[in-house]
Amino acid sequence: MACCLSEEAKEQKRINQEIERQLRKDKRDARRELKLLLLGTGESGKSTFIKQMRIIHGAGYSDEDKRGFIKLVFQNIFMAMQSMIRAMDLLQISYGDSANIEHADLVRSVDYESVTTFEEPYVTAMNSLWQDTGIQHCYDRRREYQLTDSAKYYLTDLDRIAAKDYVSTLQDILRVRAPTTGIIEYPFDLEEIRFRMVDVGGQRSERRKWIHCFENVTSIIFLVALSEYDQILFESDNENRMEESKALFKTIITYPWFQHSSVILFLNKKDLLEEKIMYSHLVDYFPEYDGPRKDAIAAREFILRMFVELNPDPEKIIYSHFTCATDTENIRFVFAAVKDTILQLNLKEYNLV
């Protein structure tokens, strides 16, 4: 009998040791894998940031991968021009050249989501439309309707994109717009640590899916598009995009789930802010702004303050960076700083510093 008990005790001890070893391993693995949750409203630059991580810290994009974006680039071109053609009617702008009415009808007749090629007569129609003085005036009034940020980038380079041997460049890929539906995870290794970056859809309809992502989040990276101070929401014509972004940020930083997560604020699209601030005045949309006009630095510092002031916890530091998600060198530099911040905070969490 004693022999049996001894065997049972040995087995129990072995099981206990196994459990303890597994728990230690789980804790070690949790420390080695850092979960970064990318949050922000639609079109703030989250997907572009993940693409940059793939370029900087991952496998990048092979020629085959690049070819996979060709169709999306074509669709973005049709989508952008169709948005402007619709806006021409809405804003009651006349075409500079009446021949472009026919070109507009041709482009309008296409279902952009089913576009797979970019050939004649569409190339000529697009080129002619983009050079039209009416369309250019319509482009200048883009804050009054929905137009992708990449419209000008693609439409000024139509001949390159329409070439028979066209393959998407990295910049084409970074600028292509495809709304994120569902949750995209991108894991990458850096200095023996696995970073798991999670991108969730920013449009309102996507936000109910976020709840699953809230466990064990090391850091939240919240993206704000600096250029959206004068724009309306995709989902609602009378709501300011930046006000929506502020409301979302306030909700996120007060969630109990994120009590122990560090918060990093990316004030993105600083390049677009620099262009826009020269003709669209911040004070017209945020009357409390009392800084100089046409001053991008003063404008972005004011926007940063607006977001930081939403933090109700004086103990919680909001780490912030001004970014341009389509600029690989800028993101390389910024993420190196972010990585150091996250690692330092993570070591403190595990009492290793």
UniProtKB/Swiss-Prot annotation:
Q: Which InterPro entries match?
A: Gprotein_alpha_Q, Gprotein_alpha_su, GproteinA_insert, P-loop_NTPase
> Residues annotated as region G2 motif?
172-180
Gene Ontology terms for molecular function:
G protein-coupled receptor binding; G-protein beta/gamma-subunit complex binding; GTP binding; GTPase activity; metal ion binding
G-alpha domain mapped to chain residues:
32-353
Q: Where is this region: G1 motif?
A: 35-48
| Quaternary structure (record) | G proteins are composed of 3 units; alpha, beta and gamma. The alpha chain contains the guanine nucleotide binding site.
**Record-listed Mg(2+) binding positions:** S47, T180
UniProt keywords, alphabetically: GTP-binding, Lipoprotein, Magnesium, Metal-binding, Nucleotide-binding, Palmitate, Transducer
Lipidated positions (S-palmitoyl cysteine) are C3, C4
> What cellular component GO annotations does this protein have?
cytoplasm; heterotrimeric G-protein complex
Q: Where is this region: G3 motif?
A: 195-204
Q: Which Pfam families match?
A: G-alpha
Which sites bind GTP? 40-47, 174-180, 199-203, 268-271, 325
- So what does this one do? Guanine nucleotide-binding proteins (G proteins) are involved as modulators or transducers in various transmembrane signaling systems.
In Swiss-Prot or TrEMBL terms, this protein is called Guanine nucleotide-binding protein G(q) subunit alpha
Q: Which SMART domains match?
A: G_alpha
Q: Where is this region: G4 motif?
A: 264-271
Q: Which family does it belong to?
A: Belongs to the G-alpha family. G(q) subfamily.
Region spans: G5 motif: 323-328
Q: Which PROSITE patterns match?
A: G_ALPHA
Entries under CDD domains matching the protein: G-alpha
Q: Name one GO biological process term.
A: adenylate cyclase-modulating G protein-coupled receptor signaling pathway
